[in-house]
């Protein structure tokens, strides 16, 4: 397996969970990425509406200190498609996601 050290590029990763779940489902990914030196944030979406989930994700993106990879699982894919227009977003990753 090839790994990239964080001094070669983007250091921030934001993880967005799907519906009928919460951010705890990302714990293994969080542990793996932080062990490799990435700064990882897990969004805790309220799942009250699409707009509320996008707003929660945008608030997390506002706090990032540079280019960020935004990752969405399932319903989180729909959320990151909208939030992906944020100036800090360098790329989107869809994991079994809806667009």
Language-model regions: role of each:
Residues 6-66:
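Active-site catalytic motif of lipid deacylating hydrolases and related acyltransferases
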Residues 66-99:
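Conserved hydrolase catalytic core segment
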């Amino acid at each position: 397996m090839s790994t990239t050290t964080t001094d070669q590029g983007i250091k921030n990763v934001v993880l967005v969970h799907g519906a009928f779940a919460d951010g705890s489902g990302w714990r293994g990914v969080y542990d793996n990425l932080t062990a490799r030196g990435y700064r990882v944030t897990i969004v805790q979406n309220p799942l009250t509406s699409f707009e509320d989930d996008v707003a929660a994700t945008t608030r997390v993106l506002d706090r990032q200190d540079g280019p960020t990879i935004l990752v969405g699982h399932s319903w989180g894919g729909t959320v990151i498609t909208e939030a992906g227009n944020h100036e800090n977003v360098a790329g989107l990753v869809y994991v079994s996601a809806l667009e």
